[in-house]
């Protein structure tokens, strides 16, 4: 069945559209005020003792970890909008190609498996499915960990850093 224009208009989730639209200025402010650069400096300084050849992967792992942590307590759109300028600033400060870092943010923000809070669908099945918070941690943490490890090794192959 093909949707009519009216049906397609009615199926739009306006709350998500409004949330993303409202958060885009937050991402711009983070970038324009220098906050992204400041946070990027903190993140980059965490890898000063790491050998240079490992710094790109360690930074990528750190960006992914921070993003996945935030996406578990916030919406994935909000997390991506906040972390994207920070990840770009980290890459630029270190002289790396930012594409792998941006994709790390995109993948991590979309991998909300550890809590029912981070993603709407998780919340929808949480109550009716009779799940406990610990069920999400038990199943979601190993899955998120596997995604994290895969991202650290695959993203630099696709977008060399």
Where are these regions (language model features)?
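Membrane-interface interhelical connector segments
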Residues: 38-56
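Re-entrant/interfacial helical elements at transmembrane boundaries that shape
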Residues: 38-42, 78-90, 102, 119-130, ...
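Alpha-helix N-cap/start motif
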Residues: 5, 98-99, 133
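Short helix-coil transition sites and intra-membrane helix breaks within transmembrane domains
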Residues: 29-37, 69-82, 111-120
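Juxtamembrane and boundary regions of transmembrane helices in multi-pass small-molecule transporters
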Residues: 94, 106-161
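Hydrophobic alpha-helical transmembrane segments of multi-pass integral membrane proteins
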Residues: 50-90, 94, 102, 106
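Hydrophobic core segments of alpha-helical transmembrane domains in multi-pass membrane transport
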Residues: 1, 21-27, 60-70, 88, ...
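Core transmembrane alpha-helical segments of multi-pass membrane transporters/permeases
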Residues: 9-38, 57-69
């Amino acid at each position: 069945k093909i949707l009519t224009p009216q049906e397609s208009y009615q199926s739009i989730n306006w709350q998500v559209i409004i949330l993303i639209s409202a958060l885009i200025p937050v991402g711009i402010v983070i970038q324009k005020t220098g906050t992204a650069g400041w946070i990027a400096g903190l993140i980059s300084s965490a890898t000063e003792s790491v050998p240079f050849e490992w710094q790109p992967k360690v930074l990528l792992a750190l960006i992914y970890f921070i993003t996945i942590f935030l996406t578990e307590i916030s919406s994935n759109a909000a997390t991506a909008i906040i972390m994207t300028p920070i990840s770009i600033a980290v890459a630029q400060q270190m002289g790396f190609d930012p594409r792998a870092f941006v994709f790390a943010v995109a993948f991590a923000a979309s991998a909300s498996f550890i809590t029912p809070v981070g993603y709407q669908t998780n919340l929808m099945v949480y109550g009716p499915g009779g799940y406990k918070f610990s069920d999400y941690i038990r199943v979601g943490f190993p899955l998120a960990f596997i995604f994290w490890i895969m991202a650290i090794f695959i993203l630099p192959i696709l977008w060399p850093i």
